[in-house]
Amino acid sequence: MSDIEDLASGGLFDEPKDFYKPEEQPGSDSYARQEKHVAASEYKEPTNFNLRLTAKNPLWGHLLWNAGKVTSDYLDEHSKELVEGKKVIEFGAGAGLPSLLCHAVGAKQVVITDYPDADLLYNLKYNVDQLKKDWDAKNADFSGPSPCADVSSMKVEGFIWGNDASELIEMSGGTGYDLVILSDVVFNHSEHAKLVRSAKELLAPGGKVFVVFTPHRAKLFNEDLDFFRRAKDEAGFESEKLFELKYYPMFEEEEETKELRSMVFGYMLTLKE
């Protein structure tokens, strides 16, 4: 037996058991509208949204966040005022739940943005397409208003906060957007100035910026809140606190911070006329 054959037979060149790790697969989750919101809405369907999530991703598209659910609940409840007939844009959309909800309850236009990562954008487009497929499969005989029968007014775009937003403004017809959604993005403390700048640049006259977040890093809660100071000092936004809701923590970390990490806070930003 040659030396090479001897080494090979001894297992030196055998591949470790975990050498061929299976590729991580996309996940899934779902969201159900609250019955009281459906009952009060002109738009009775869909009542449920099936969402594809990315495989584990450093940009966090693999989770359906509490803030996204709460954002959707609030916009469903207040759709007459905030959504119906409005132009809507979402930053850092992840799976896109709030944007999909806005389309379903009568938004005129919805632009869904996230960091220009191929997996994130593909996943968002998948969820837009799935919204229509789910509608077609379940509601062929539905006679009520049906925005989900046509998703052509929904667009998915890559966007880096603080970068040139002229294309997004052009997509709005040059007017800007009536509602800018920032759902669970203020934990990016280094990006606050860019977030504020882009939100103001894309906002239509009289428009609103809806900010919802959870303090995932409880010890940095004050830095989360600093977003609102910067929004006032750097862009002239006025902030109104709308709610703080007890949910559950997204991550199991320090027991002593569990209470704060369970909270979801909502604010509305407007510019002085």
UniProtKB/Swiss-Prot annotation:
This is Protein N-terminal and lysine N-methyltransferase EFM7. The gene is EFM7. GO terms for molecular function: N-terminal protein N-methyltransferase activity; protein methyltransferase activity; protein-lysine N-methyltransferase activity. S-adenosyl-L-methionine binds at residues 65, 92-94, 114, 161, 183. One of its GO terms (biological process) is methylation. Its EC number is 2.1.1.-. HAMAP family: Methyltr_EFM7. One of its GO terms (cellular component) is cytoplasm.
